[in-house]
């Protein structure tokens, strides 16, 4: 009797897990169709810039410094400017002082500087998954889209690097299960957060890549002392 009860309980858990998986897959398909319809109406030129790994669309505003090594060449820390909106255009969070002024969330005690995050070979959760995928994967661009923007000097296959600027239109499954909100002075428009299971638009600029952050910061401090002095004295 006890064994039968345990078997029934296990079967019930498997059934619940199967139902949850089917529900998630069903929602993903629905959201994909909804996001595609939104892109068709608002950004039809990006439909063929769809990235199958992650299910997002990309607009490349700047390919970046093609002499610089791509992020995906190595494991590194990435410094990147970042601003996020919902599909209605409301700013949810920003690292940019000009946008903070624009939406009335600017504070004098907030240091508006780029994010600084680790970007390894495997997704660790330190980045929004969609931004991680864009950094690590080769972006495939529609040849007609590339031809329509000769001033950007875009290749049809691009790996992000220093200077790259992109806009990502991401489904919620590569954004986060809990939605998005700004904090610590990086809030967007007052009263706006991104609810769970909602697409997210991210504008991102790659500012720098660093292999060893401590060594890099040490060099920056030394350079500041040498160049600006400011009464500072270096000690060995």
Where are these regions (language model features)?
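Sec-dependent bacterial lipoprotein signal peptides
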Residues: 1-19
